[in-house]
Amino acid sequence: MLRQLLLAALCLAGPPAPARACQLPSEWRPLSEGCRAELAETIVYARVLALHPEAPGLYNHLPWQYHAGQGGLFYSAEVEMLCDQAWGSMLEVPAGSRLNLTGLGYFSCHSHTVVQDYSYFFFLRMDENYNLLPHGVNFQDAIFPDTQENRRMFSSLFQFSNCSQGQQLATFSSDWEIQEDSRLMCSSVQKALFEEEDHVKKLQQKVATLEKRNRQLRERVKKVKRSLRQARKKGRHLELANQKLSEKLAAGALPHINARGPVRPPYLRG
């Protein structure tokens, strides 16, 4: 199975076709692990006992044609809880319990992959049929390998207790209460950021509307100025024509130098 998974990963590592491109929301922004941990429904620390292949279904599908020969793309995992569930979780199961996780494999925008006999931190959610699925908050990773860095991060964010022998996480959480008291909740900060971004978008829309109206007003002012210039030019032409006409009329009213004078009345003698 591991060989099949590696082969599938190599196949998917090639350049994707245009129809296979991952489409994320235009307003998408990456979130940190700590922020996504606050938004995840459930966090468990468990070891993978076995892997089982799965056929394409509601939670296992690809945007391109799936062929029967592409085995190993989708699978489920049987895991064993290494610690009691983190506080604040809706999933209440003790250490040593075994769970089945579905919805694992290689997808268009992300991959939820695990290896048998290895331990991981899982972000999980439960669907309406009580199936446990990876909770890919913000379209990002939902499975984290068992490393010292991840142990330190998750033990400072969540309270694990009653872990199996050799799996104690409490050694990293000496300052957990201090961090929890002084840390702003990421969800509220994220909400405030979203609201601020929405406000900025609305302001940008208003600015764009005002700029459009300003351009329209400028065009109207240009047209009015052009009409005014044409009216002034036409007025000057009319004034010049009127002046010439007046001069012609004035010239027609004066007697000509060769014209006969007015006829005098006859002289009467007494």
From Swiss-Prot:
One of its GO terms (biological process) is signal transduction. Residues 1-21 form the signal peptide. Residues 188-251 form a coiled coil. Keywords: Coiled coil, Glycoprotein, Secreted, Signal. Glycans are attached at N100. One of its GO terms (cellular component) is extracellular region. It is found in: Secreted. Its main location: secreted. Expressed in umbilical vein endothelial cells (HUVEC), and at lower levels in aortic smooth muscle cells (HASMC). Induction: Up-regulated by pioglitazone and down-regulated by TNF in HUVEC. Negatively regulates TNF-alpha-induced pro-inflammatory response in endothelial cells (ECs) via inhibition of TNF-alpha-induced NF-kappaB activation in ECs. Positively regulates lipid accumulation in adipose cells. Homodimer. This is Coiled-coil domain-containing protein 3. The gene is CCDC3.
